[in-house]
Amino acid sequence: MPLQVSDYSWQQTKTAVFLSLPLKGVCVRDTDVFCMENYLKVNFPPFLFEAFLYAPIDDESSKAKIGNDTIVFTLYKKEAAMWETLSVTGVDKEMMQRIREKSILQAQERAKEATEAKAAAKREDQKYALSVMMKIEEEERKKIEDMKENERIKATKELEAWKEYQRKAEEQKKIQREEKLCQKEKQIKEERKKIKYKSLTRNLASRNLAPKGRNSENIFTEKLKEDSIPAPRSVGSIKINFTPRVFPTALRESQVAEEEEWLHKQAEARRAMNTDIAELCDLKEEEKNPEWLKDKGNKLFATENYLAAINAYNLAIRLNNKMPLLYLNRAACHLKLKNLHKAIEDSSKALELLMPPVTDNANARMKAHVRRGTAFCQLELYVEGLQDYEAALKIDPSNKIVQIDAEKIRNVIQGTELKS
């Protein structure tokens, strides 16, 4: 049972109480202080000090200072008044127990409120940090969008500048052609003047040299007229025999029918033009050429301006949808932009147009299979991707890069099967 401490001293003012409590040699670390508005307890085994205060105090602003084997309490009163005693008198044990329990409950409620306030503050801090992160990410996204927009505007300006340059070059060529025509016309006029002058000189000379007489004058006059008029050109015909195109295929592996069909399809594709497009009226002649648009798209692809390249290929396909290389090149752009389903569609369309399979279109078919297989693999459809890579290897078995990629896909498929 702890020993009650009674040798304490206290002083007061109207606003505060100063309590001095000796520790009796007990270590400060073993001292436990519990203070509420009506109750003060100091436990420093084997001693115990307990005070049921005369009036309520402000326990939050009250202080305790330990030094020189003594605890000095500064207890601030809630109401300014002088106390008759430090502890209330005439309190029985039941009343003391109620005061203790009430003080403990108040302390627990206060601790709970402090914990909840701390948790709420932590949530607010997390919410603020999340909002800051979202704001930073939004700024980064906007920055990236602005960079893309600036690149698009830059590419558009470059394209417009290139068009303007082409237009001026065409105008310059036209002016040069007109100047050459004017020079040729001047030369022709001068030649005609010289011919007229020579013919007049001959007429005068013949009149002076010829004997006088009607018959002789008529003979020479008719002769001069015949000399001055050139004879009509003779008509002839030129026969042209075109050399037939021969494919470099061995006779035992000859695919003459398929090769002829492929040539026929290529010729039809070059002739197939769709001119019923509203935008054509705003374009120059070279911009209406699918081949020119294809070359322009290739240049934009080389500069990593994939969106502008797709626009060029789109217009070329609208003009001529029978050219397989347009779909093949557009599939490469979609791969770079991660438009995987569109890349698969364009590769499949290119393979449809690259029929029948001949040596002349083998390289294009191999690229179409590789690009479609790459799109399948990025969609995690590794079995379909491997099928396309194996089809590409059948076309070009010596391609080391395709062999390595196909082996990697096989390893991925085998690893997936083992996990499952």
UniProtKB/Swiss-Prot annotation:
Pfam families: CS (PF04969)
Biological function: Involved in neuronal migration during development of the cerebral neocortex. May regulate the stability and proteasomal degradation of the estrogen receptors that play an important role in neuronal differentiation, survival and plasticity. Axonemal dynein assembly factor required for ciliary motility.
Location relative to the cell: Nucleus; Cytoplasm; Cell projection, Neuron projection; Dynein axonemal particle
Annotated keywords: Cell projection, Cytoplasm, Neurogenesis, Nucleus, Repeat, TPR repeat
Top-level taxon in the UniProt lineage: Eukaryota
A cellular component annotation (GO) from this entry: nucleus
Coiled-coil stretches noted in the UniProt entry, renumbered to this chain: none
Transmembrane segments: none
Region annotation Mediates interaction with ESR1 and STUB1: where it falls in the sequence: 7-103
PANTHER family xrefs: DYNEIN ASSEMBLY FACTOR 4, AXONEMAL, DYNEIN AXONEMAL ASSEMBLY FACTOR 4
Entry keyword Nucleus: yes
Annotated TPR repeat ranges: 290-323, 324-357, 366-399
Domain CS: 3-87
Oligomer and partners: Interacts with ZMYND10. Interacts with STUB1. Interacts with ESR1 and ESR2. Interacts with DNAAF2. Interacts with CCT3, CCT4, CCT5 and CCT8. Interacts with DNAAF6/PIH1D3.
Protein name (database record): Dynein axonemal assembly factor 4
Keyword Cytoplasm: yes
GO MF assignments: nuclear estrogen receptor binding
